[in-house]
Amino acid sequence: MRLLIFSDIHGDKAALEKLMAVEADYYFAAGDLANFGRGLETMGPILQRRAERMYVLPGNHESEADIARFCREFGFHDFHGRTMQIAGYHVAGLGYSNPTPFDTPGEYSEQELKERLQRFSGLRPLVLICHTPPKGTALDRAGEGKHFGSDAIREFIEREQPRYFYCGHIHEAAGQQATLGRTAGWNVGKRGQLLELPTLVK
C-alpha cells in the first residue's frame, strides 16, 4: 500500500497539483492547506479528484470546525484524532500545533496534546501522522537552529515507539529525516513523502 503524506501547502495550488498527480492508495493532508483558514475552498477542487482516499488534518492555520466543514463539503475524510488500519498497521492522525507566537486558530497546549495522544497508546505497529514535529530534532529545527516542536509529541514517540512518524509545521525542516529510538520520522513539507507499507502477515 502506498501512502502519500504532505503538509503546509498554504494555498500553493501548483504544489498541490503535483501531489495529486502522484498515484497512491491513500492521501494524507497533514495540516495548513490554507492561511489562517482562508482559501480552503480553492484547495478543495484540486484534492477532490482523490476524494474517496483523502484524509485531512487541521494544522495550526485551520480550526477543527474549518476542516470538518471542508471535509463534508468536498467528500473527504476528517482524520483529526482518528485511527484506521491499513495493511495490518494502525494509522493515527492528530492535527493542530503546540502554542505559537502568532495566535493561529489551531493550537493546543502541551497538556492537551498529551491527553489527545493518549488515545493512540498501545497501537502497534503504528504510523503516526501529526501536524507538529517532536521537540529537539531535525524535524523541528527552524532559523538559527532554534527548535519549536512539541514536548508532548516527543514524549509519546519515545514511549510508544511508532514504526513511522510524519509531520510538517516547521517549513525550514521540510524534507528532513530523524530517528527516535526505533521510530523513523520525516517532516514532509509541501513536496510530500511516499510511504510503501508492506502487508503484514499475522
Regions found by a protein language model. Name each.
Residues 23, 50, 72-75, 181:
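Short, structured coil segments at secondary-structure junctions
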Residues 11, 62-149:
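Conserved catalytic scaffold of divalent metal-dependent phosphoesterases
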Residues 5-7, 27-32, 54-60, 78-80, ...:
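Active-site neighborhood of phospho(di)ester-bond hydrolases with catalytic His/Asp-centered motifs
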Residues 34-35, 39, 51, 131-170, ...:
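Cap/insert and terminal regions of metallo-dependent hydrolase folds
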Residues 1-45, 49-50, 64-65, 122-124:
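N-terminal active-site segment of His-dependent metallophosphoesterases
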Residues 15, 69, 83-87, 104, ...:
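Binuclear metal-dependent phosphoesterase catalytic core
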Residues 13-17, 40-45, 65, 77-79, ...:
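A generic local structural motif
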Residues 17-18, 40-42, 67-70, 140-142, ...:
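Short amphipathic alpha-helical segments
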